[in-house]
């Protein structure tokens, strides 16, 4: 097997949308039912995707809102971003659009590896954001999209596998662009 690659992923979103729950479900395989606001935590996990082993460093950020100022560290050495909203919260869906815009401004690129995640899909009776709305938003950003339930462990692993694939796809496009040569 090839040497493992290191990738750093930041998880961003509005308060109490399940960023930490999704991350802990992926890393430790358990759901934390209590809400304890995160300042910032970093987790590590080894995962194999398409035969390649990845050493992931996951930056679980504090909840942001439309007035949050992003620390510069959110743009340094980050290989991909998971943007999380709750399918039970219109506010979180609106704020994720603001977060996306601020992220693009901070990183200084139009296209970055992003995975949009609609979390809490197990709360059917409280749903206010449809799957189609989430998918349409992701498509408008040219981002990957999944809905998830950290509580029921639905697609937690898929979310992190997918962001790795998105990051690798962009890395491939970047390295292909670098290898081309023009003589004038």
From Swiss-Prot:
Record text on subunit structure and interactions: Associates with the mTORC1 complex (MTOR, MLST8 and RPTOR) in a guanyl nucleotide-independent manner. Interacts with TSC2. Interacts with MCRS1; the interaction maintains RHEB at the lysosome in its active GTP-bound form and prevents its interaction with the mTORC1 complex inhibitor TSC2, ensuring activation of the mTORC1 complex by RHEB. Interacts (when prenylated) with PDE6D; this promotes release from membranes.
UniProt lists the gene as RHEB
- Cysteine methyl ester PTM positions read 181
- Which residues, per the entry, are lipid-modified as S-farnesyl cysteine? 181
Q: Where is this cross-link: Glycyl lysine isopeptide (Lys-Gly) (interchain with G-Cter in ubiquitin)?
A: 8
> Propeptide residue numbers?
182-184
Q: How is it modified after translation?
A: Farnesylation is important for efficiently activating mTORC1-mediated signaling.
Report what the protein is called: GTP-binding protein Rheb
Any further remarks?
The conserved catalytic Gln-64 found in other Ras-like GTPases seems not to be involved in GTP hydrolysis in RHEB.
The record's listing under InterPro entries reads:
P-loop_NTPase, Small_GTP-bd, Small_GTPase, Small_GTPase_Ras-type
**Record note on what altering residue 151 to R does:** Decreased ubiquitination in response to amino acids
Phosphoserine PTM sites in chain numbering:
130
Annotated compartments: Endomembrane system; Lysosome membrane; Golgi apparatus membrane; Endoplasmic reticulum membrane
The main location is: membrane
């Amino acid at each position: 097997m090839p040497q493992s690659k290191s990738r750093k992923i930041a998880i961003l979103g509005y308060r109490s949308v399940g960023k930490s729950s999704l991350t802990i479900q992926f890393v430790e395989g358990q759901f934390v039912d209590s809400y304890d606001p995160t300042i910032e935590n970093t987790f590590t996990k080894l995962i194999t995707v398409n035969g390649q082993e990845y050493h992931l460093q996951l930056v679980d950020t504090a909840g942001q809102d439309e007035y949050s100022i992003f620390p510069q560290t959110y743009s340094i050495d980050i290989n991909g971003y998971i943007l999380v909203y709750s399918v039970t919260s219109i506010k979180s869906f609106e704020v994720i659009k603001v977060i996306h815009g601020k992220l693009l401004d901070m990183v200084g690129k139009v296209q970055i590896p992003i995975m949009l995640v609609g979390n809490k899909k197990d709360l059917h009776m409280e749903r206010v954001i449809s799957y189609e709305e989430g998918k349409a938003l992701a498509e408008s950003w040219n981002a990957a999209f999944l809905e998830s339930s950290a509580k029921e462990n639905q697609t937690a692993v898929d979310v992190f596998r997918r962001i790795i694939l998105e990051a690798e796809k962009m890395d491939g496009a970047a390295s292909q662009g670098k290898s081309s040569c023009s003589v004038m």
